């Protein structure tokens, strides 16, 4: 269900990306919206921003960068930025383009074919961690694998 204009204006949205060009591109779509903020920053150092906590955290394709300590950053986001009872949506890339053809899975070192164990390891870690914190966790998707977690009440 889509939010109406007043509902949208009552919610604070913050987007964070390491890429300055991605931030500038995103800002163009939300120029008139005072409740939407975009920040160019390294997510390894989120604590520098003093963001506080949020009811919903969405991270799509950002935690799988090679310069990120996945487990530590994920746990920090959960512990420091998700409200008690909040929800998370995490998107894990499950495909890449090679010569105009979509290939599923990731290219792993020393393999001549796509391999899923790295992304499945990350998804399993998040799922197990959140289930231990009493979240209902569902994994869906195809091109991206989405982990959706809601607190069990």
Predicted regions span which residues?
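Conserved beta-strand signature within the Rossmann-like core of class I S-adenosyl-L-methionine
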Residues: 84-95
């Amino acid at each position: 269900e889509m939010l109406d204009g007043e509902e949208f204006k009552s919610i604070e949205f913050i987007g964070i990306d390491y890429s300055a060009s991605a931030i500038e591109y995103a800002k163009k779509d939300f120029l008139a919206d005072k409740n939407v903020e975009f920040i160019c920053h390294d997510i390894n150092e989120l604590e520098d921003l003093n963001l506080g906590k949020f009811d919903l955290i969405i991270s799509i394709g950002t935690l799988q960068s090679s310069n990120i300590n996945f487990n530590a950053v994920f746990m920090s986001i959960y512990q420091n930025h998700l409200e008690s009872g909040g929800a998370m949506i995490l998107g894990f890339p499950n495909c890449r383009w090679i010569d105009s053809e979509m290939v599923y899975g990731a290219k792993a070192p020393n393999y001549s074919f796509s391999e899923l164990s790295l992304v499945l390891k990350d998804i399993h870690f998040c799922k197990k961690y959140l289930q231990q914190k009493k979240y209902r966790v569902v994994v869906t998707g195809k091109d991206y694998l989405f982990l959706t977690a809601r607190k069990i009440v």
